[in-house]
């Protein structure tokens, strides 16, 4: 590690919010430490021993700032101006990066106008997905852009379990169409029954409901009701309908042979990142992490039939399973580890 990498500290700032400040003096730390897990946008802070702050009036010690741009872009613009006035070197990144989320933001023209002003003011931009890099350049063709998905503490954490059984469904949002959650359950259940493997699914809260159903959902949980009724037709299915702490969630995932999903949201790919930490394959999905860590298993450019065939092989071929896991760790250490990300971030900020 170079001296510049070792001294580089990044403050990740999100406008609004009430979480205050979380510092990462020990990097990833240990699973179960207080605060948010060092993944997603918190990972950029953790991999540089920096901090994550929320609130428009956050006081920063660090001179290098990654500013998260949410749906209220004029608020982010105001904070960006204040940070620059304070002498900070500010790089921006969109917080909600699914294509349908970005498209929803820009249905409001004022947001697009504010985004263009933000891209004109920022020192640079961080693209967390393949699809966001050209978006920044569309707003400002001269803006320096670094492509760097959220890293994972793959070198620091190994959450593997000696006992593995069944298939873990990676998605949980039934009513977010791009997740293809119901389709994943419908298609994997016959394979699981054929191979005598249990299926675990988390019934997430119902989101993206029509207005009337959103009100009624306070009385009837539509997501849980759907999963309950589906499980009645699939005896091998286990439905978890409660909120799980992050540590318990990862331990639960690690007890399975693989993660299965049909997500087409084009997100950074936390599902694949979680599977990586658990040392199990992630099959399907077109997120950035899925495509980088599990290139031979991801859903990008593959049919559902091909994806199910990969599941079948992983469940029945132990040597193939072990090779896939070994290769995923190797790729992650090279391209999505904390050490690799820290070096890329340091070099990018120095270049601005």
How should each PLM-predicted stretch be described?
Residues 105-125:
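Membrane-proximal helix-turn-helix segments that form the acceptor-binding/catalytic region
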Residues 315-350:
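A charged, aromatic-enriched C-terminal amphipathic alpha-helix characteristic of glycosyltransferases
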Residues 23-31, 154-156, 161-244:
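Conserved catalytic-core segment of nucleotide-activated headgroup transferases in glycan assembly
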Residues 1-80, 300:
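N-terminal pre-catalytic "stem/leader" segment of glycosyltransferase-like enzymes
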Residues 260-272, 286-287, 291-293:
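Nucleotide-sugar-dependent
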Residues 251-267, 280:
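Acidic donor-binding loop of glycosyltransferase active sites
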Residues 98, 131, 147-157:
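Short beta-strand->alpha-helix junction loop in the catalytic core
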């Amino acid at each position: 590690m170079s001296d510049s990498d070792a001294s580089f500290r990044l403050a990740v700032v999100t406008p609004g919010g009430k979480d205050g400040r979380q510092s990462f003096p020990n990097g990833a730390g240990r699973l179960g430490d207080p605060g948010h897990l060092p993944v997603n946008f918190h990972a950029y802070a953790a991999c540089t021993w920096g901090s994550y702050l929320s609130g428009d009036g956050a006081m920063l010690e660090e001179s290098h700032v990654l500013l998260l741009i949410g749906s209220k872009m004029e608020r982010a613009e105001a904070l960006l101006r204040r940070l620059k006035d304070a002498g900070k070197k500010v790089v921006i990144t969109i917080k909600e990066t699914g294509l349908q989320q970005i498209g929803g933001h820009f249905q409001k023209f004022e947001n697009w106008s504010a985004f263009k002003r933000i891209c004109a003011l920022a020192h640079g931009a961080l693209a967390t997905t393949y699809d966001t890099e050209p978006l920044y350049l569309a707003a400002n063709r001269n803006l320096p852009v670094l492509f760097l998905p959220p890293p994972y503490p793959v070198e620091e954490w190994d959450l593997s379990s000696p006992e593995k059984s069944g298939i873990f469904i990676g998605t949980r949002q039934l009513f977010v169409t791009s997740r293809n959650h119901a389709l994943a359950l419908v298609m994997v259940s016959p394979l699981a029954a054929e191979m005598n493997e249990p299926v675990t699914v988390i019934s997430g809260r119902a989101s993206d409901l029509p207005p009337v159903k959103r009100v009624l959902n306070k009385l009837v949980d539509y997501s849980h009701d759907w999963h309950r009724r589906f499980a009645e037709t699939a005896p091998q299915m286990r439905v978890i309908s409660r909120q799980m702490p992050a540590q318990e969630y990862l331990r639960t995932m690690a007890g399975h042979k693989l993660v299965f999903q049909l997500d087409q949201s084009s997100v950074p790919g936390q599902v694949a990142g979680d599977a990586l930490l658990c040392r199990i394959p992630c099959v399907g999905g077109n997120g950035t992490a899925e495509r980088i860590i599990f290139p031979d298993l991801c859903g990008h450019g593959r049919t559902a039939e091909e994806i199910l065939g990969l599941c079948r092989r992983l469940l029945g071929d132990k040597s193939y399973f072990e090779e896939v896991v070994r290769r995923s760790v190797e790729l992650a250490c090279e391209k999505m580890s904390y050490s690799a990300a820290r070096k890329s971030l340091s070099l990018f900020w120095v270049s601005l």
